[in-house]
Amino acid sequence: YVGLVSGTCFAEMGVHVTCVDVNREKIENLQNGRIPIYEPGLDEMVMRNFREGRLSFTTHLTSVLNDVDIVFCAVGTPPDEDGSADLRYVLAVAKQFGENIQKYTLLVTKSTVPIGTAQKVKAVIQAELDKRCVNVPFDVASNPEFLKEGAAIKDFMSPDRVVVGVESKRAKELMGKLYRPFLLNNFRVIFTDIPSAEMIKYAANSMLATRISFMNDIANLCELVGADVNMVRKGIGSDSRIGSKFLYPGCGYGGSCFPKDVKALIKTAEKHGYEMKVLNAVESVNEKQKSVLFNKLFKHYKGALQGKKIAVWGLAFKPETDDMREATSLVTIDRLLREGCKVRVYDPVAMEECRRRMGGGVEYAADMYDTVLEVDALLIQTEWKQFRLPNWSLLLKLMNNPVIIDGRNIYDAEELQHLGFDYYCIGR
């Protein structure tokens, strides 16, 4: 994901880029114009730059290594069994890099990696050079990505900032040259030492996750004391010291970044003898929040869920992506199935991903209205634009019981209650 978006956007800025992956099928698909991920605008940009010769794809790093100045490492760093980042793929790239470089080359880590990874990468590369009995100069750098799935191209082409961790003048000059088009557009390129760059990525995602869990905690308290979390959100978000972003309560965060990065930062601290008490609480709140829709449904039906037909709108962890990694919908659906519910689901783009993950355990609807046919409740998991203004009269006709549980607070409670729905949301 990160590698394809980054490589394509660099090509769009005039850089000649070769994307490398060990998966031959993926490379062949890209060469034939089949994009393996859903990201708005990416397919057109890939094909344009491929057609114009600035973007190519291969399975062989060795075939291009001596023709490039910079190698970006954007492989996955999945959580290990204990929650820490698994660096096997990053270190495998470093090993191959050390085995094959013939001239000065800069290896830049784009993957989200724990603080101290650059030193491990350097050690692996140097060990391979020593085996070859050669003295080829190289540098490593850290250039963490801050891409939001669903808005990744915009984020790359118009970033808030670009963070680059380096430890040599040569590496800084090379990265400065690469990002010069961004400097011309007055975007900030922040050069740091490498450990700081590695920390910035984890700290940024953990801060955003903290805001989400804090607002979910506030929302849950609002329900108990009779306050409206949307009014609270507007009131505190108007404070310039706080701002309004990432203050929306809901049914928890998911995706490939926040859960993994929060856990990895906690584990990094533990390895250094420190406890991240705030982040432990953030993680705990989020795990509980993932069950909030199920809990509201359970309470509405007083626990009698066996045989109930339940519709779910939204499967991806957020709109404008088909990514279901750590999606809250998975928790909700699992709880529903274990209670004996019959579950029918719909998502504008994540249906195939859901089939891959869940198989025949749920029923797959043809569209958003097919989802609610004769159901006993509708659960909103993802705030896709398509779901914002449904035909309420049609929903009333199609549903057995007009119960809506809105996990993203996208509807007006008074309007739906006036129409005859039993409507539940977060924090009101």
Where do the language-model regions lie?
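Structural/interface elements that position substrates and couple domains in central-metabolism enzymes
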Residues: 1-428
